[in-house]
């Protein structure tokens, strides 16, 4: 229909036909739905349509509303000055139209990863069990990137119902899911004789079962989006998932379980075009919440270190490159694995640890 309208009304100097798909769809009993390349433009289209309806209603209050004829409507739509303005607009970012969910969204790695995705045009749902903290992060991102592209949801990844609700919120707000960054986690350290069953279960509940619940809940949305391409899962693992760590058996083995889950999912889901990869960081202290928990006295204390600056120096000196590992470094790797730049990579692991010989590929 739109193509026929264009052919009837075009002039010799008319711009080429634009997207023939409808922008506004009116569904009786449901409402007005707008479709565009990004959430901001969709909202603006909805507002313009609403204002147009209000003008029509206002006109009907004093007489009959007379719509412009087809040719006049075409000349407005394909006005050459409007076309010149459109041609001068910057190219859309590589993540425009993509929808991501980031668990552990209030922490250092989660916020850095979300920021990296939104900077390239993605819409992001931040999920974190700390509702107040994740809402604060969301508010900051709304000011930075715009209120249309970010939402937050309270979610404990060990709670099956909360995980399901988080993905329902993602579908409701943005109509799908293209990228999952499974990042929610904890850190613990204790020798085996002091590792309680409760501590062991807590690590496996969050780091193994939590990743399983998150990935499983995402799958129905991924299945609906697979024809669009670019569907990607990124697990945030750990150097300790592949390198034995004395005094951290619960944490390290749970991380290893999550990494092997990623391998299994990569194998299972490749025929569906869903990619699954892992980023293994090490010693991310700056911007991390782990310094505020028991890990400070359990882990850092075993090295005789009780000041953050001393611990950062300890890990920096331990690395082969002698450099700090920051949340933004992990975010860069996660972004690459989520993007089309890695479209032919699945089942892989990237180490962002400033060089740790224990984790070298053997």
Describe each model-derived feature in a short phrase.
Residues 334, 346-362:
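Short C-terminal tail/terminal secondary-structure segment
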Residues 191-192, 196-204, 315:
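Substrate-binding pocket helix/loop in short-chain dehydrogenase/reductase
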Residues 220, 267-268, 343:
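Alpha-helical segment proximal to the catalytic Tyr-Lys
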Residues 215, 254, 262:
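Active-site helix of classical SDR
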Residues 181, 270, 275, 345-347:
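Short, small/polar-rich loop/turn modules that mediate ligand/substrate recognition or access, typified
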